[in-house]
A protein has these predicted regions:
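Long, structured stretches of catalytic cores involved in phosphate-ester chemistry, encompassing
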Residues: 1-158
Length: 158
């Protein structure tokens, strides 16, 4: 029911940009889970890894098939910061990371197939809508824990 609601709402939206804020990653990649973390479930807890990977692939394929080019996801339940693009669907994802540097994972590896940015520290994300009504731009900034911008990406309406 939730999935159908989300898909219908995204398709019916006439917004210049669609942003899904999720508690876990949909793109990832999320390879460090499983052996690094020792808690029930083994850490396979997202749509970007084996936990819910089949649902993640299904949703990313749906995004691609529906040509939702002005759609991004933002998540915060990874312990590193990143901007990734799914190589098959083109879905863009941003992760704010842990709220402190001390809670960051130090073993994540840059994956050029997905990552456009990877930082093994904490911080937060800000999003701004800039430009004009005729030429809007969504700017996503990833900040360190002190507020300094460490990465910036613009999403243009297509």
């Amino acid at each position: 029911m939730q999935k159908e609601w989300l898909e219908r709402t995204l398709l019916e939206s006439d917004a210049d940009f669609r942003v899904l804020i999720s508690p876990n990653c949909i793109v990832g990649p999320d390879p460090s889970h499983g052996t690094v973390f020792k808690y029930p479930g083994g850490g396979a807890d997202s749509h970007g890894d084996l936990g819910f990977g089949h649902e993640g692939r299904e949703f990313r394929k749906w995004v691609h098939d529906k040509k939702l080019t002005n759609f991004i996801t933002i998540n915060g339940d990874r312990h590193w910061q990143y901007h990734s693009v799914d190589p098959e669907s083109g879905l863009r994802e941003f992760c704010c990371g842990a709220v402190t540097d001390s809670h960051s994972v130090k073993k994540e590896k840059y994956d050029p197939k997905y990552h456009r940015f990877l930082r093994l520290k904490g911080g937060f994300i800000s999003v701004a809508l800039d430009g004009t009504r005729q030429d809007p731009r969504l700017t996503v900034r990833i900040h360190d824990v002190e507020g300094k911008t460490v990465f910036e990406s613009q999403v243009e309406r297509t």
